Amino acid sequence: MRTASALAFTLLLLGTSLAGCAGLGGGDDGKDSDQSLEVPLWEVGDWWLYTFSTPDYSDDTARLVVASDTEEDGSAYMLAISSETEARRHAVLNHNPFLGRMTKDNLSAFENGIAQPVLTFPLAIGEVWSFSLFSNDWSATVLDISGNLVVISAQSSDGASLNYVYDEAVGFFSSFIWTDADGSENLRMMLAAGGEAHTGEVFFVRGGDLYSNVWDNSDPDAEFRDTFLVSDHPSSGEWTEMIYFLDASCGSGASTISLTLRDHTSISALARVWGPGAEELGTLGTIPYPSEEYTLTLTFTGNTNLRLKIAGGITESWTL
């Protein structure tokens, strides 16, 4: 028998999902909660609009679209994004595991080249299974089925949790929440809308982390220098671009930041300067055809903050 706390969590998630899916076709269709749910059949052009919330970055919204149903010799779909800019953002921030290949048997996402069954069909109350995601191992349980909605909770040995709701009416998640052991949310993914027959160009950027750091400075003057090597993607070869994401802020008075990124031939690939009171948040940019070693040089004056993430990217696109 489930504990009172588990039941309370189930009711909370169901309430949240029902509210978030109004108008999407979700809800109770009279299905017996003892009945299992089979894997949905996606078609090219099916789409889901999600809002992604994280503690470190502003919320962003992305439309995920089934771009192909012939991946992995016909055993997987390709899930892409309707905006190339958003595809790049997701590649460098790396907070959305449900992009790229998704298996047809369980809608399994791939992590480090291995399919991970975040869902396992048929879904039935009491089903238990394990998978890896976000570089962690999880044990998942189906807590409840109510109408089209399946409430699932996964726990890790370090006390973190994944709480998510699968909605049979839309064939994907209505919510997906990753929480640390201390209760802080790393990711909240909420469905806003869904549909069929998307038309236009869609994109998937195969990404790989190259560099990431955060600097908080309060000294009168500080300088930082670092290098990183641009290695190829392990299976797809050379990156076609580097994608960078940055947040920068300077206090009042004489606070300043300067940033220079040079390649192995000392050619400047990126140069930025921020003056007193300046603030720039969520900037996304690209550097074409990266290779070999890069040197990053930063100078800080006064109260300043800088966050920089750089990833390699290889863009694929489909016209639907």
Where are these regions (language model features)?
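Acidic, serine/threonine-rich low-complexity disordered tracts
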Residues: 29-88, 106-108, 112-117, 121-216, ...
